[in-house]
Amino acid sequence: MKFIKYLLILFLILKINYFVESGVDCQKNTEYFVENSCGKNPSKLNINTDIYYFESIGITPYSPPVYNESTTNYFWYLKDGIEYTFSYRYKGCQNIKSHSIVSQGMYYQLLSQPLCPNTYFNYTIYNSGEFGGNTNYYSTPQNIISSNYNGSCTINILITPLSNSKGAFQSSAAKYTYPTCGFNNGTISVDLTKGYSNCHLFSQFDTSFLYEIEPSSPCFYSGLESNYYYLFVDSKECATERLSIQLFNVFTPLEITFENVPDYNQNSIVSLSLSSGDNGILNKTNSFATVGGTGPDPLSTWSHKETKITSTTQFGYFYNKDFSTDPLKVICSFNDGFEPQKFNPNFNFTVTKSDTCLENVTITFYPLPSQTFVVHDYILGNILPLTNNVLSVQYNKFLHISEISSNSERYYSTAFYAPIYRVVETSNGIGCWKTYNITIGEYQIYSNLTMKVYDGDEYEYIFYPIEGVFVNVPANYFYIHYKVKDCEVESIIMIDKYEEITPMDDVKMDISIYELGNCTHETSILVNIDTVFGNFSKVYSSFSNGYFSFYLPNCSCNIGFYYSIPPLIDSETFSYGFISDLDCNSTGTVIQLLGSNGNTIQEVYSNGIKLIVNNDVDTDFAYNIGPGENNVTIKYSNTKGTCYKSQMINIQSPYEVPLVEVTPVIDCDSSDGKISISNYMNFYSLDIIIDSSTIPINSGLVSNLPTGTYTIVYGNSGSCANSIDVYVPSSEQYVEITTSVISHPTCGEQSLNGDGKVNVTLKVLGIKKNTFYIQNQNQISSLTFSDGGVYIAAAPGLNTLSISYGGCIWNRDVNTTISKPTFSFEKIYNDTCLSSVYYKLINNNTNIAINSITSPYTLYSYQNEYYTQMATNLIYPYTVTWNTYCTETFYQEFTFDTPFNYYSNYIQYEIVKADNCNSFKIDIIIKNMNTFQKVTLSSKYPTPINSTHAIFKNLPPSISYDISFTLFDGCSGTEMVGYQQLSNGNTKETIDIIKVNDICNSGKGSIQLSNMDTSNHYYYVKTFSDYYVYTSYPIQPTTNDNGTIISLLSNLPVGSYNITRNCKSITNCYIETKVVIENKDPIIESISVTDSYDKLNNGTAEIKLNYNSTYPINFKIIGTQLSNQNGIFSNLPPKTYEVQVTLTDRMCPITISQSFTINFKTSPTPPPLPQDPSDELSTSSFIQLNILSLLLISIFTIFIL
């Protein structure tokens, strides 16, 4: 019992001593204050006491504490409008102190989240008045910016609806029509059958909603003028909606007829007229037409105005709102524009050629008055001179013809007698492993016939034909070079058989060192590749690792590979020389490294210690070395930094230095560290620098030193002084230091500050110390923390903590691991019309307190919550700062998708082409007008046809039209219409074309044009050229025997041809027809037979082909010995035969066969012979002879019997 009593007394004494020593008053409230926010940032709860004096401290609802580097105290972020409980317990105390905290920052509250995009809702801004009052507001969902009474605080909040697909607009219940200027006939209506009621309409300028506009009938408003309106309407699914409606003035469509538009820089004749809309109120007496500008400049007549049409030309009309002719009245003015940038002006020239290459090609241009033609040699780039619009140019030129005023162009080739060719794939390979035979027709007439290809390294390879056939050439661009007839200049045509993909299944590769390099010479790599084309090898040179490309010769195959260069070896040898005074005993011996050989010294080490360049010496590569033996390692590289090596040399420094012995600090309070120098007698002078003061060292001993690094200055004469640094450590014998990781860092690198927390406990001579200093020696900008024994900026990895108490310093290594936080923006709302998608930053890391977020793009913040809105696909960068010391930039890809798609085909339409170019007009009929609030084309509104159809009439010529529209839900877009329909022309006319395909790749295809109107039109043929551009040339018409104008394009090889007819008087009035000349194999066109008479075997057969080859054709009847080269067979007995026809033509080496039958034909009965005496005698004698023979045969038979 006494023992327990003594223990209890001892416990009370120790407890009393603890509280006396710590000085903690368990009943005292800690000092704190609330820093109220100003809208954007959250409020803060600040404390004036170090957090580590508490056993526990925090707020509920939970928020992590944040370190304030400027005050060295902690704070907590508070969300305004929330009541927090602030609780804490001092160390050594049992009682928990609690306080209720409510910040008074400016914030907002919703009664409920709005239901639909236009729901009219109420929200309250708190603490926005001069004395903390609150203000109620009404709005529709949007990003709301609101300021307090004096504008010193601004709040930025994002209100999103629960649904973006519901509402009066979204369901097409709310509709409106635009008023015609001056008529006040606009309407706004709501379909009450769709669940809507209680409509109220106000002008948007009536901000207090005092003057309601009365409806004509429930929820139908008529007689409205151009204005901005608010329509309020109730429904169950959206509560009260406030619809914002803007009614624009529309105009009676202006119809423009272009009677003559030869070129948009020349005068053209146009006629203008109004449609029959608006009940015929507008007419030519109370409205005035204008051409050529935007201002009122009335014409004397509405038609036949000559003007130059340019990109700024305006056609329009105006009238007074009261339809009077008083010029001082307020007017309605409409203008429509013309878009010549979409047109090509007429471009006419003719070409005259001869059959000899010795004469030039003549090209004659026929420009309009404003046109100027310039011709360039496409290959050489130089301008070719024109004389009176006539160009005389050699054959074998590729011309670029441009027209200056319109910035339009054509290409034309004068290649002479381009060969006909046939391409046949000869392999089953894929990708670039394909091979081809290219057969040149009539190759005998060409000289210097070669084919050139270029590999990826731009080396030229030449193939030569075998009897006009380039055999098994690999996939690539083939350039056929040739001379023909009397041409001295080489012509070139190109055949595109390039294949980009290189399959690697059958490729074997061997890479080896061909020649090992060094720091001045690259290493050479020998690459051997075994492919379907054979074995290839190539040498590459490089200093460093890299990705290489092996382009196989001749073909388009490209084999990539990566190779690592082995460490390069250099034979560099370094020497050194002493620079410092040899008579001055010193550790500051300076050496100069010699023999750099153009290499760059990276680092120099002596006995494992990195040497610093001596900048006080006027020479390169000078370093200080220590006394005695120095094993110096030199690390160097070549000038490109691709070759690294190290070399070691031994340098002996002859100088003597102080021999030092150090006694560590044991008593931290008295700092009893010592430095003793045993050879102090050998120096002329010997001093120590303490706190910037130089103190002589007497008898070689310095005492009462705290832990630290000291500089010993010594010299052997009065003119020479040098120094060494000596570190006095603290004794580890009487200290206990324990470290533990409170929390691992969430950011940082080893040399930078992190946010990890490390607890340090220090006992000296068995006594726990509560106040000491901690630094991290591994960090560049080291922080010092003196309270609580906690280091709060630990970085990932090794943290060498320097713990200072009194005159002692100890180092402890603490390893931490990083636990990086993750942040992400999550989509919270898609608005209806693709204008924005809203995202909110999600922070799921409970140990993270965000200090701030920045981004180069839109970013909203409210109460430490962050939002952004996007209207496109992009990689979104944002920089987050958290837990005071952490900053990192994150990237998130935003993929933009919303219900509305600008590029969908919303408009259903029909293009009505012009009848012809003499009465040119194009109409566009909109077939689903009931799905749009508004449809316009160049500010023009269509003329209604009925409830679903409307028409844009008499449109100017174009290759397409951009129609703008607004849907009932408010979404707007622009759609290009007509491109496909007008790509083959913009009139209803056609060109009569008769096509004859090529046979046997002979280049004998043809295109015949008839019903040609050369008085009003130009005709062109356009085909793909050898230089990836279209070659155009005019078609020359002829007149046939019937007086009809026709044109026959003959001797056409296989290919695509665009036949274009351009109008002479109307710009861009054209017809274009694509004609494809295909290759067809010859066929047996006919077999003519003559049947055979009985037993005479006199049948005949004649076989004819639809192709006359210049090469022999072999005809053979299978199963017989009959064969020839003309296809005519005779003396054929009746039966069925099969003829086989073999063509030896190189352009189509084929065999075809067909059966035919020689039928049996009975001989006809001979006619009666004439009855003259000689005939009778002969007949009688013949009969008598027969009777006698018969009698003899009978007698002989009887005799035998």
Swiss-Prot record:
Annotated GO CC locations: membrane
Signal peptide (UniProt feature, chain positions): 1-22
Keywords: Glycoprotein, Membrane, Signal, Transmembrane, Transmembrane helix
Extracellular-side segments: 23-1180
Membrane topology value: Single-pass type I membrane protein
Residues linked to a glycan: 68, 122, 150, 185, 283, 348, 360, 437, 448, 518, 535, 554, 585, 631, 759, 815, 830, 844, 946, 1042, 1058, 1098, 1108
Subcellular location: Membrane
Transmembrane segments: 1181-1201
Keyword Plastid recorded: no
KW Cell wall biogenesis/degradation (keyword) present: no
Protein name (database record): Protein dduB
